[in-house]
Amino acid sequence: SAGVGPSRSLLALLFGAQFGGFLTLVGVGSNASAASVMSEMGYKPFGFFTITPFGIGICILGTLYFTFVGSKFIPDTGYIPEFADAGKKELDKKKATIAGITMLCVLVVIAMNPKNVPMHVAAVVGALVVVGTKCMSVKDAIHAIDWNCLILVGSLTAISTGVQNSGAGDAMAKMILNILGDHPSTFMITTVIFFAAALLTQVMSNIPTILLFLPIGFSIAQAINVSPYAVAMVITLAGAASYATPFAAPQNMMTVGWTHYKFSDFIKIGIPMVLITYLVVVIAIPIFMPY
C-alpha cells in the first residue's frame, strides 16, 4: 500500500531486526550463545542490558546509514512472498493480547535474571503458556522450532568446549597473538579480534562463530593479561555483525529465499554496516568495558 516492493521491505526489516538485536542479550541468537559459552567456561555471563550501550550506537548509526545510503542499493526483485498479505488477515485480539503479555513477562524475568530461573527455563515456560492458552497449536509450535539450528548449536557448544580443553584454542590464539605482537595497544587488540570474528561470521554464520571463537578469545585475554569480558564483548558484537553475506545468519538465508536477492546485494549493503559496527566498538569498548 505504500508503493514499496515486498522484497525491499523485507530487507529493510531484516536490517532493522539486526540493529535492534544489539540492544539486549536475547536480541540475537549469537548474544545468548555468548552468554552460554561464558557460563560453561566459568565466567559470569553478560547481563540482559550489558550490551545495550554498544547497541544504541549501532542502532542510531545503522539506521541513519540504511535510511540515507544503504536503501539506495536495494533493488526490487519483483518477488512477492506467500505471506505478503498476512497483514490483511483478521487479528484475534484475545490471542494477541495473551501472547504479547506472555512475551513481556518472559523478557522481564530474563532481564531480572533470578538465580533460580535460568533464561532458557523462562522461555520454555512462556512457550508452554502460549500453547496452553491455544494462541498456537501444538502442531504449529513443533513446526516453528528450527530443529537443524538446535542440533547445530548443541553440537557446536560441545565443540567449543573441546577446542578449549584440547589446546586447539591456544594454538589458534597464538596465531592471533603473533599478529598482535608483544605489547599490543587496546586499539590493535580490538581491531584484530573484531575483524577476525567478523570475517568468520560472514562465511560460517554468527552462532557457530561465537561458539568456536569465544574460547580462543579467552585464551588471548589470558596471554596478554587483559579483561576477558572486554574481549568477549568485542567477539560478541563482531559475531552479531552478520550483514555482508547470505550465510552470515539464518535470517539472511530466509530473506534470500523470500526475495531472491543476490550475494552481491548483501555485500554492497552489508560491508559498510560491518565497518560502522567496528567504529562503534572501537570507540565504546574503552568507555563501557575497558581492557
Where do the protein language model's features map onto the residues?
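Structural signature of hydrophobic alpha-helical transmembrane segments
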Residues: 27, 55-61, 116-127, 175-189, ...
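Alpha-helical transmembrane segments of multipass membrane proteins
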Residues: 18, 37, 41, 107-111, ...
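Hydrophobic transmembrane alpha-helices of multi-pass small-molecule transporters
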Residues: 50-174, 190, 273-274, 278, ...
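Hydrophobic alpha-helical transmembrane segments of multi-pass integral membrane proteins
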Residues: 25, 182-220, 224, 228, ...
